Amino acid sequence: MADLKVTQIKSSIGAKKNQRDSLRTLGLRGIRKSVVREDNPQNRGLINVVRHLVTVEEV
């Protein structure tokens, strides 16, 4: 499977608790911070919860 580069583009201020928790679980701690994660159903689910706060690229 490919890897996914996830970049936070919007602040988590005002987001619901489960959305903030999903960002932390992905390893994102601020705007314009990026992480590379394996492309699997668990990570896709976390990304889906915060899809309005992040961008995703295949690496």
Swiss-Prot record:
Pfam families: Ribosomal_L30 (PF00327)
Domain of life per record: Bacteria
GO molecular function annotation: structural constituent of ribosome
GO biological process: translation
Coiled-coil residue windows: none
One GO CC annotation: cytosolic large ribosomal subunit
Keywords associated with the record: Ribonucleoprotein, Ribosomal protein
CDD domains on file: Ribosomal_L30
Keyword Secreted: no
SUPFAM superfamilies: Ribosomal protein L30p/L7e
Family the entry assigns: Belongs to the universal ribosomal protein uL30 family.
Subunit: Part of the 50S ribosomal subunit.
Record's protein name: Large ribosomal subunit protein uL30
Species annotation: Nocardia farcinica (strain IFM 10152)
Gene label: rpmD
